[in-house]
């Protein structure tokens, strides 16, 4: 479609087009003859002000035209500021659309201005509607005895959370108990959001529209208002919380002997950062040093929690070993993180490495997910009540694996990927990733290996999970 035939169509609009062949060529061209539905009408951009009007130059490079704003629609915005503008009309005889300024964001380059620009550009609302906030404000902050009586009471079990040091909300927790027979009772708990967010409410509709929380470098755009995300649904220490739990009896070989799934009430004894839990694992001691402590002061951890972390670490290693033997593929990609000053400006960069404390949490979350899927998947019949959404990974793309083989051979890793069957493919991939670990080419090869995998899909069809 040539630029002069766009017919006022913008990126991702639904349009009606007249298709024809070019003269002296079999190539097809099209004219857009009707805009059926606009995908987007609001844009972030910089205002260029004249005496009686202004133009907004959009940040989105795919927005090929400026937006004209009449003087009475400028909202007293000054020249050169970033604004949010909405297209209100596009007269037939005008080359540019007409619009009005909805919001003045600030000066380009300013941290808060740019963050809000990103949020608005991608349609990520950082404010909740008043009716949603009002509904959230009615949620009780205490738990009734009547609700506790309906649940399995886990408040007396040793329980803790391990999260990034800058985390504001704590979604999951682990509990630990040694049973009389020598086995371990391990609970994996997540906040029971469904208790607070009921169907056909403003809260549920807003959460549905947002779909997920969005994590930026210096903040989170939550799916739920703060009273939920950082309050009643955050498993903060020294507070009773409603949770949904997977509870396993596990022996010292990391074999699951018994399992239970259901609603619980817990009481977290302690909140750890990954670095603090890692220090316990490495030193096998109960002292968190001043340099590692998120409080900035050295402190002592209760002996029962130290025992729990060290035992869970040994079980996690055994669970991981079993997964790899069964064909799981493990990617330890380096993640780049930023150090921010008090104004949220980046002052440094570092590489985030996944250590034993991270892998401990990962293993038990994987165990809970896998066992829940197996439990539901083993139910017979096709009744609607047993319908379940699975996260599945199809087999990797063979062409991409062969391309990966070709690339790694140039680094001296010839014949490293054995494509004979699923087991040989996964085991040889793991061996390759192990061989490249810590080398200059490791991040590139791991990235290519990840891209050769099929993307995760959420479906009611349980086709299995590769790796």
Predicted regions and their residues:
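S1/OB-fold single-stranded RNA-binding interface
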Residues: 1-161, 165-173, 179, 183-187, ...
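Electropositive polyanion-binding surfaces
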Residues: 84, 90-91, 117-124, 131-467
């Amino acid at each position: 479609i040539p630029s002069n035939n766009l017919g006022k169509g913008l990126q991702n609009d639904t349009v009606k087009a007249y298709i024809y062949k070019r003269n002296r060529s079999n190539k097809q061209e099209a004219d857009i003859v009707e805009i059926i539905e606009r995908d987007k009408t609001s844009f972030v951009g910089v205002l260029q002000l004249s005496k009686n009007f202004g133009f907004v130059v959009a940040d989105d490079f795919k927005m090929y035209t400026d937006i004209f704003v009449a003087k009475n629609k400028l909202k007293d915005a000054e020249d050169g500021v970033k604004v949010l503008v909405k297209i209100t009309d596009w007269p037939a005889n005008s080359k540019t659309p007409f619009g009005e300024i909805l919001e003045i964001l600030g000066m380009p380059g300013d941290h808060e201005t740019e963050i809000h620009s990103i949020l608005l550009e991608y349609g990520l609302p950082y404010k909740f509607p008043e009716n949603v906030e009002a509904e959230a404000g009615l949620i009780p902050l205490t738990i009734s005895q009547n609700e506790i009586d309906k649940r399995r009471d886990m408040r007396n079990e040793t329980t803790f959370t391990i999260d990034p040091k800058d985390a504001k909300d704590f979604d999951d927790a682990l509990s630990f108990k040694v049973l009389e027979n020598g086995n371990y009772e391990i609970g994996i708990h997540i906040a029971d959001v469904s208790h607070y967010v009921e169907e056909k409410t403003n809260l549920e509709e807003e959460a549905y529209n947002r779909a997920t929380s969005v994590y930026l470098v210096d903040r989170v755009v939550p799916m739920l208002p703060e009273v939920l995300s950082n309050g009643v649904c955050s498993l903060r220490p020294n507070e009773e919380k409603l949770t949904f739990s997977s509870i396993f009896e596990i022996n010292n070989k990391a074999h699951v002997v018994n399992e239970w799934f259901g609603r619980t009430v817990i009481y977290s004894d302690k909140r750890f950062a990954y670095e603090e839990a890692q220090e316990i694992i490495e030193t096998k001691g109960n002292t968190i040093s001043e340099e590692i402590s998120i409080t900035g002061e050295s402190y002592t951890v209760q002996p029962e929690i130290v025992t729990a972390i060290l035992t869970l670490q040994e079980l996690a290693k055994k669970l991981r070993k079993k997964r790899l033997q069964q064909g799981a593929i493990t990617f330890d990609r380096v993640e780049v993180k930023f150090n921010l000053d008090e104004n949220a400006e980046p002052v440094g960069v570092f590489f985030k490495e996944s250590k034993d404390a991270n892998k401990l949490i990962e293993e038990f979350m994987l165990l809970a997910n896998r066992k829940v899927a197996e439990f539901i998947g083993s139910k017979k019949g096709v009744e609607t009540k047993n319908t379940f959404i699975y996260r599945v990974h199809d087999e990797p793309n063979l062409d991409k694996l062969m391309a990966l083989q070709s690339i790694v051979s140039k680094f001296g890793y010839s014949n490293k990927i054995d494509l004979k069957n699923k087991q040989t493919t996964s085991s040889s991939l793991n061996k390759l990733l192990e061989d490249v670990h810590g080398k200059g080419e490791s991040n590139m090869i791991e990235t290519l290996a990840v891209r050769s995998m099929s993307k995760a899909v959420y479906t009611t069809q349980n086709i299995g999970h590769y790796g």
